[in-house]
Amino acid sequence: MPESTPFAAPGPELWSRLGWTPDAGQREQLITLQELLRDWNTRVNLTRLVEGEDFWVTQVLDSLWPLKPELDTADTPRRCIDVGTGGGFPGLAVAIALPGAELTLVDSVSRKTAAVAAMARSLGMADRVSVRTERVERTGQDPRCRGQFDLALARAVASAPVVAEYLVPLLHTNGQALLYRGRWQQEDQRDLDPALALLKAKTVAIERCELPSARGPRTVIRVMPEQPTPHLYPRAVGIPSKQPLGIQADDNRS
């Protein structure tokens, strides 16, 4: 049976939770994005979160609430990167909400990146949304990407120390990494802090949100570089997830 709650469609209740309301064009783009995702999902297994609250709360709202400061200056030119974009979230939702931004969306699965690139074209955003099919460890060592971004985003990719190693090398001096997390506790921060020390970065803010309709707690960890990231990071493909910084012994602490 289709959901009939206030959060199952793009109405005022949804936007009041975000503190931001899309203009008519953005609202139409978000509706079109749902239609495109529904269509592509019949051909490529992108996500099960396509209908009703699954889409509007767990995809759109969850993608955008960490960006409340940026939504206040949505037309400001920014370079943003979404690591592990999967079915295009948060990247495509962010591109709609921040019309001044250029987005780079990264995923290692070619069938997913092909679908996401096609959706970006259908949404009329191909001029400012680019898609890369590669492991993010390679992205972070590519001079065209390393140290180039104002915002680096990752949602539901890996543990926080691993995500930090993926994102921090992509930031320029004043850039910020946004680590999308669920519940965040002191022990999570204790795991993250040693990784940030190795990356020459620091936590600058921890923001929390309770998604409506019992969708659970969410946290975003904002991280900034304090110095240029050591060239070692990110390490070779697969190493960050197998040997998370600060959790397992690291031979490069000295």
Curated annotation (Swiss-Prot):
Residues that coordinate or bind S-adenosyl-L-methionine: 84, 89, 136-137, 155
UniProt-annotated stretches for the region Disordered: 231-254
Compartments (UniProt record): Cytoplasm
Gene Ontology cellular component list: cytosol
GO molecular function: rRNA (guanine-N7-)-methyltransferase activity
Parts forming coiled coils: none
UniProt EC number: 2.1.1.-
Reported function: Specifically methylates the N7 position of a guanine in 16S rRNA.
Family: Belongs to the methyltransferase superfamily. RNA methyltransferase RsmG family.
PANTHER family with a match to the protein in the record: S-ADENOSYL-L-METHIONINE-DEPENDENT METHYLTRANSFERASES SUPERFAMILY PROTEIN
Official protein name in the record: Ribosomal RNA small subunit methyltransferase G
Upper lineage: Bacteria, Bacillati, Cyanobacteriota, Cyanophyceae, Synechococcales
